[in-house]
Amino acid sequence: LVGSEMCIRDRKEEAARRGLDCENSVPLQYDAYLKPEVIRMFKETGVLSEKELEARNEVKWEIYIKKVQIEARVLGDLSLNHIIPVAVRYQSLLLDNIAKLKETFGGYPEYDDMSEEPRRLVRKIAGHICSVTRMVDEMVEARKKANRITDLRTKAIAYHDTVAPYLDEIRSHIDDLELMVDNQMWPLPKYRELLFIR
């Protein structure tokens, strides 16, 4: 395991050893409110009844679902309508550059060296474009499947387990594209630019 993954695994093992809850699924964390001892505590203190706790959990699951839905829709839109078109445009510029290098230096031995980096970039960009497009499609299908579920808890768990993981995976490919695509063409503020906004 690498760095943070090892740290997370160690923390989970330590929490389990101490008898602490180490659940990291948000929808499942809300189940703690419906444990018998928690219900009893809320009843005895007169704060909330069991029905009120159940209602609050339903609201929390619904809020979680809505947040992941919105984030998935926005990321899908940004990916397909803003990031991919810019990456394709930049890739086309690189391909034009490769064609002009071949036209000018095609018969000379230095052509391979001169065109190696643009060709490598074109391949990498193409890989990221394909991955983002495929993952956005898969994420949309996972959302459609989760939306057919009527029970809010089960639906929230489905969103956590099948939709939310795509957010990080897609973002990782977009982060890589951000480092490759020409700064002038990139449609969104880059991380380094956000650091210096006043």
Identify the role of each PLM range.
Residues 11-198:
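Mature extracytoplasmic or organellar-lumen-exposed domains after removal of signal/transit peptides
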